[in-house]
């Protein structure tokens, strides 16, 4: 709280609250994957990126900052949420410092790139810190269905906004930060124009296999089948961000999902059915289906797997630097779904209780169709936080059947 107040006081000359009000009136400008590629082509211009980001970043920051202010007061008072707010205030102020700088001032342009890198690093722990705030709130005040629904709505939008802001920061810093990536010379920033989907899936499997072997002393094998309908016989390639795809498949593979379920469901038999992955590339979609025989989950629990407030894992320690990112928060699946949805794809789960689960990732096959999905602060969003959620308009079954012998007709 003190840090946030100090930042607001130090920024009073720049009227940060007024700037947030001003920039939140504008809608973010979603970019397609093709536009990201054009920005980072051989003719990439740092000045052009500078002029775009100094306008776009305040809009994206301000839009989500307005939504943060609509959270329950007790959640806003948690130390973790206060810390996240302070990061956003500080980052917005630093971007606004370049509002009146000339794009012809090379020193200012280079200084902007340094600032972008600093902001990117500052926001490294936004996701686990906000998650910690949700845990602090839940432990202190409990959670009711209405608050849970509002927090779920907010966190989906907040984390999607964070993914989009980080994408802009990464692209600019990787392209103009002066450090080339020798391991991926053909990447344009964080984007691979010819992302080999099968290779990324195998990388995700191998990483998850290491964890599974360490914990269970064994692991299910991978059976991968691919079908390129678009270009038969050719490698399965799309324009995509490999780190996003890796995050999704690793999360689905790793110990807390397909591998763990398979190992624990078949522990008595000591025979571990393989995990089947089918990859297809059509004219519109690239689809990855992962199937395990880990026993599945009941239909009523599917939605809970994507609920931020539902996690039953022990409270993690954010300050433990060696911990796996998001370990213990139960955020792996909901964040993975946001990565899929970010460029107009999706991630869905289909479960057969007693048998296993199918997870399906949808990705747009064309770079022109892969367009950012961005939250915008407007009247509809405001109403969602302020609306009174009334009783369900469908009858709710009671836990005990009605005794019809005592029933009287009207």
Please state what every model-predicted region is.
Residues 184-192, 233, 272-279, 342, ...:
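Structured cytosolic regulatory/catalytic domains appended to multi-pass membrane proteins
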Residues 16-226, 234-246:
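Signal-transmission coiled-coils
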Residues 291-298, 310:
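Glycine-rich acidic phosphate-binding loop
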Residues 244-255:
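Conserved N-box helix within the HATPase_c
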Residues 223-227, 262-265:
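Cytosolic nucleotide-binding catalytic cores of signal-transduction proteins
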Residues 2-48, 60, 69-75, 99-103, ...:
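Flexible, glycine-/charge-rich segments associated with ATP-binding catalytic modules
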Residues 218, 241, 255-293, 319-321, ...:
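ATP-lid-like helix-loop hinge signature
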């Amino acid at each position: 709280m003190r840090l946030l107040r100090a930042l607001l006081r130090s920024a009073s000359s720049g009227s940060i609250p007024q700037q947030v009000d001003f920039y939140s009136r504008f809608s973010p400008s979603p970019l397609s994957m093709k536009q990201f590629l054009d920005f980072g082509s051989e003719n990439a211009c740092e000045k052009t990126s500078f002029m775009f980001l100094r306008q776009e970043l305040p809009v994206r920051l301000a839009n989500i900052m307005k939504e943060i202010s609509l959270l329950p007061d007790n959640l806003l008072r948690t130390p973790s949420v206060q810390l996240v707010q302070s990061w956003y205030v500080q980052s917005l102020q630093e971007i606004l410092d370049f509002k009146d700088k000339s794009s012809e001032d090379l020193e200012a342009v280079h200084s902007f790139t340094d600032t972008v890198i600093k902001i990117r690093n500052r926001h490294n722990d936004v996701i686990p810190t906000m998650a910690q705030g949700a845990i602090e709130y839940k432990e202190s005040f409990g959670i009711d269905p209405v608050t849970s629904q509002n927090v779920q709505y907010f966190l989906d939008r907040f984390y999607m906004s964070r993914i989009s802001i980080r994408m802009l920061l990464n692209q600019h810093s990787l392209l103009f930060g002066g450090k080339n990536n020798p391991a991926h010379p053909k990447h344009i920033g964080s984007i691979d124009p010819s992302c080999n989907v099968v290779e990324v899936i195998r990388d995700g499997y191998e990483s998850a296999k290491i964890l599974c072997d360490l914990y269970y002393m064994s692991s299910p094998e991978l059976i991968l089948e691919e079908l390129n309908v678009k270009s038969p016989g050719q490698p399965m390639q799309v324009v995509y961000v490999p780190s996003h795809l890796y995050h999704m498949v690793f999360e689905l593979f790793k110990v807390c999902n397909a591998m763990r379920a398979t190992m624990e469901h078949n522990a008595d038999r000591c025979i571990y059915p393989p995990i089947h992955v089918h990859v297809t590339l059509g004219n519109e979609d690239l689809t990855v289906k992962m199937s395990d025989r880990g026993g599945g989950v009941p239909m009523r629990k599917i939605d809970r797997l994507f609920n931020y407030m539902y996690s039953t894992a022990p409270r993690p320690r954010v300050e433990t630097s060696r911990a796996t990112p998001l370990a213990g928060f139960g955020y792996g699946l909901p964040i993975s779904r946001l990565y899929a949805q970010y460029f107009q794809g999706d991630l869905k789960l289909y479960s057969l209780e007693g048998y296993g689960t199918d997870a399906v990732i949808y990705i747009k096959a064309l770079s022109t169709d892969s367009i950012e999905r961005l939250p915008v602060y407007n009247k509809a969003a405001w109403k969602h936080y302020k609306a009174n959620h009334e009783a369900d308009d469908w009858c709710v079954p009671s836990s005990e059947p009605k005794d019809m012998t005592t029933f009287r007709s009207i």
